[in-house]
């Protein structure tokens, strides 16, 4: 179930203030954030966010196609480990 349309999108006020301040000073340094649920708005385009994935901060560069999505969608929290396969250890036991 999504967020109610009458409430509008969730945008972290601190992030929005930092981006607006950087836009006026034309700075482009990465912004560190834990707000994975924050919706990407057009003001974020061209900025890099360091989004926390539960363990470390991953860089996410914002483009036009990302507007409307959440920051957390681009910072994966899980690592896929491959199944099976031939390794030295598995062949040495035979």
From Swiss-Prot:
Keywords from UniProt, A to Z, are: Ribonucleoprotein, Ribosomal protein, RNA-binding, rRNA-binding
In the record, what terms sit under GO molecular function? rRNA binding; structural constituent of ribosome
InterPro entries for the chain:
Ribosomal_uS19, Ribosomal_uS19_bac-type, Ribosomal_uS19_CS, Ribosomal_uS19_SF
- Report which residue ranges the record marks as coiled coil: none
Q: Name one GO biological process term.
A: ribosomal small subunit assembly
Q: Which is a Pfam family this sequence falls into?
A: Ribosomal_S19
Q: Which GO terms describe its cellular component?
A: cytoplasm; small ribosomal subunit
As for family, the record states: Belongs to the universal ribosomal protein uS19 family.
The record's section on HAMAP family has: Ribosomal_uS19
General function of this protein: Protein S19 forms a complex with S13 that binds strongly to the 16S ribosomal RNA.
Name this protein carries in UniProt:
Small ribosomal subunit protein uS19
Q: What species is this protein from?
A: Elusimicrobium minutum (strain Pei191)
Per the record, the gene is rpsS
């Amino acid at each position: 179930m999504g967020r109610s349309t009458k409430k509008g999108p969730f945008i972290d006020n601190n992030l929005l203030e930092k981006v607006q301040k950087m836009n006026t000073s034309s700075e482009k340094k990465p912004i560190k954030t834990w707000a994975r649920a924050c919706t990407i708005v057009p003001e974020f385009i061209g900025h890099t966010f360091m989004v926390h994935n539960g363990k470390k901060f991953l860089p996410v560069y914002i483009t036009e196609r990302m507007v409307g999505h959440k920051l957390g969608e681009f910072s994966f929290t899980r690592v896929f480990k491959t199944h099976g396969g031939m390794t030295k250890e598995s062949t040495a036991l035979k």
